[in-house]
């Protein structure tokens, strides 16, 4: 079982005790938590320490002692996007820092642009990757931003192993400058996030990403790649072509008894749906448009937001100005709600979760 939001307090002979007081039987414990960087030697040597606790270095990785250079996990770096001091314990940046420091010793100039924190990992058969700023950190840094959450297939649907990829793209408003991305799925999420890392490093915009030509074969991806699709949706949001709300607001909408339309087919709806939602399949929308009010906000969703987008545009074409798409739709809602329901022990807002 997976336990979230409850840290380990003590490890005993036959069990571990969590911060909540709960105990878990255990014959063996693997601590996959990494090692904290050690700066004790630097402090003892009188080197200046930065505000984040890392060794303070200049753009060439020279410390406060002109005869000492420092690189790697123990140093303080700066965030490329915000310009603020940061720490980053990753092998890739450490290797680049080592090369730059060696060059500096020989008088070769270094173009130190800071870090964007590109990273990836695998957890229980799922791959996750991220780069740049997430939405929370962008707002914390005072950068006006927005985001889109898309869930396209990671390759052509008829290919073996095709699976949904959850992809979130963060961009600056109103410039469209790409700030970062996060992705999770069973496929090559690192490939997509690497593309965004390159765009971030070159100050690329969603327009650049929309037109980016990438490798395509049905076994590797789709003709309109995940990142291209995210850029198209982002452009629609940036230019006000439609409105959206994130999955984080759906619980409030359900509790407020908002008018939520599920445009999936009846069979999909019966397997699991938002409590209080109305099922009007996209295939029946023309005949049932009069069931949708114009005097209050209407929130649309499907499985992954593609059909609900089509429904929204059709309704806007019929004069509806009160329709809003739920970004991430039912797959995104279920993942977000399940995690928080387990962590907080709260009542679910769906009849059944659906993760596929």
Regions found by a protein language model. Give the residues of each.
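Mid-to-C-terminal Rossmann-like scaffold of FAD/NAD(P)H-dependent oxidoreductases
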Residues: 74-187, 222, 226-252
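Generic secondary-structure signature for well-ordered alpha-helical cores
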Residues: 1, 47, 76, 103-110, ...
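Rhodanese-like catalytic fold shared by cysteine-dependent sulfurtransferases
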Residues: 207-218, 222-249, 253-259, 266-299, ...
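Conserved beta-strand scaffold positions in the cores of enzyme catalytic domains, especially
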Residues: 2-4, 68-70, 145-147, 260, ...
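A short, polar/charged loop-to-alpha-helix boundary motif
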Residues: 187-205
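Short, well-ordered alpha-helices that flank and scaffold nucleotide-derived cofactor binding pockets
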Residues: 103, 107, 198, 313-317
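FAD-site-proximal beta/loop scaffold in flavoenzymes
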Residues: 14-17, 22-100, 195, 199
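A conserved short coil-to-beta-strand element within the FAD-binding core of flavoproteins
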Residues: 4-13
């Amino acid at each position: 079982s997976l336990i979230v939001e409850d840290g380990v307090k003590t490890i005993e002979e036959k069990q571990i005790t969590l911060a909540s007081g709960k105990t878990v039987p255990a014959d063996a414990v693997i601590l996959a938590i990494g090692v904290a960087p050690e700066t004790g030697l630097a402090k003892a040597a009188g080197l200046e320490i930065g505000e984040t606790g890392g060794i303070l270095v200049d753009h060439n990785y020279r410390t406060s002692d002109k005869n000492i250079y420092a690189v790697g996990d123990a140093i303080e770096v700066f965030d490329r996007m915000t310009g603020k001091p940061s720490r980053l314990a990753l092998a890739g940046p450490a290797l680049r820092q080592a090369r730059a420091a060696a060059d500096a010793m020989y008088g070769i100039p270094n173009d130190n642009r800071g870090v964007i924190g590109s990273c990836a990992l695998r957890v229980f058969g799922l791959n996750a990757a991220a780069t740049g700023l997430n939405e929370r950190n962008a707002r914390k840094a005072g950068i006006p931003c927005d985001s889109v959450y898309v869930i396209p297939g990671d390759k052509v649907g008829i290919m073996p192993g095709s699976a949904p990829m959850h992809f979130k793209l963060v961009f600056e408003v109103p410039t469209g400058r790409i700030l970062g991305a996060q992705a999770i799925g069973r496929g090559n999420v690192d490939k997509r996030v690497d593309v965004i890392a390159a765009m971030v490093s070159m100050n690329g915009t969603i327009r650049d990403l929309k037109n980016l030509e990438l490798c395509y074969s049905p076994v590797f991806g789709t003709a309109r790649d995940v990142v291209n699709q995210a850029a198209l949706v982002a452009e629609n949001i940036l230019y006000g072509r439609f409105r959206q709300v994130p999955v984080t607001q759906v619980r409030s909408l359900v509790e407020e008894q908002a008018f939520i339309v599920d445009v999936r087919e009846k069979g999909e709806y019966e397997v699991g749906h938002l409590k209080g939602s109305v099922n009007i399949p996209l295939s029946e929308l023309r005949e049932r448009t009069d069931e949708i009010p114009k005097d209050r906000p209407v929130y649309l969703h499907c499985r992954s937001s593609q059909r609900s987008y089509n429904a929204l545009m059709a309704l806007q074409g019929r004069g509806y100005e009160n329709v809003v798409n739920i970004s991430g739709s039912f797959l995104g809602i279920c993942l977000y709600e399940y995690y928080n329901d387990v962590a907080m022990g709260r009542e679910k807002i769906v009849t059944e979760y659906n993760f596929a």
